[in-house]
Amino acid sequence: MLEHALILGAYLFSIGIYGLVTSRNMVKALMCLELILNAVNLNLVTFSNFFDSRQVKGDIFSIFVIAIAAAEAAIGLAIVLAIYRNRKSTRIDQFNLSKW
């Protein structure tokens, strides 16, 4: 069971990294970042249950990471929406935000 969960977490993490590197759309990049965080959460819960199933430290930390990821997604989408309203595009390669 441990191997299957870790392999799934590695696949999710790899897909997220690949999508983040090759993404040209800001919304897609945010979704890939969320996929990476979910892969990390899966590994946290898996290791927590494998090493000591009586303590819920990994589960609690995973809930904390989910809360932080939700806040990050809300702030990220608000920034993308503001950029879209000003520039009418969400493509990453069209921007130099330091001049914005």
Curated annotation (Swiss-Prot):
It is found in: Plastid, Chloroplast thylakoid membrane. InterPro entries: NADH_UbQ_OxRdtase_chain4L/K (IPR001133), NUOK/Mnh_C1-like (IPR039428). One of its GO terms (biological process) is ATP synthesis coupled electron transport. It is a multi-pass membrane protein. It is an enzyme of class 7 (translocase). Keywords: Chloroplast, Membrane, NAD, NADP, Plastid, Plastoquinone, Quinone, Thylakoid, Translocase, Transmembrane, Transmembrane helix, Transport. Its EC number is 7.1.1.-. The chain crosses the membrane at residues 1-21, 31-51, 63-83. The keyword Metal-binding does not apply. It catalyses: a plastoquinone + NADH + (n+1) H(+)(in) = a plastoquinol + NAD(+) + n H(+)(out); a plastoquinone + NADPH + (n+1) H(+)(in) = a plastoquinol + NADP(+) + n H(+)(out). GO terms for cellular component: chloroplast thylakoid membrane; NADH dehydrogenase complex. GO terms for molecular function: oxidoreductase activity, acting on NAD(P)H, quinone or similar compound as acceptor; quinone binding. NDH is composed of at least 16 different subunits, 5 of which are encoded in the nucleus. NDH shuttles electrons from NAD(P)H:plastoquinone, via FMN and iron-sulfur (Fe-S) centers, to quinones in the photosynthetic chain and possibly in a chloroplast respiratory chain. The immediate electron acceptor for the enzyme in this species is believed to be plastoquinone. Couples the redox reaction to proton translocation, and thus conserves the redox energy in a proton gradient. HAMAP family: NDH1_NuoK. Belongs to the complex I subunit 4L family. NCBIfam families: PRK05715.1-2 (NF004320), PRK05715.1-4 (NF004322), PRK05715.1-5 (NF004323). PANTHER family: NADH-UBIQUINONE OXIDOREDUCTASE CHAIN 4L, NADH-UBIQUINONE OXIDOREDUCTASE SUBUNIT ND4L. This is NAD(P)H-quinone oxidoreductase subunit 4L, chloroplastic. It comes from Cryptomeria japonica (Japanese cedar). The gene is ndhE.
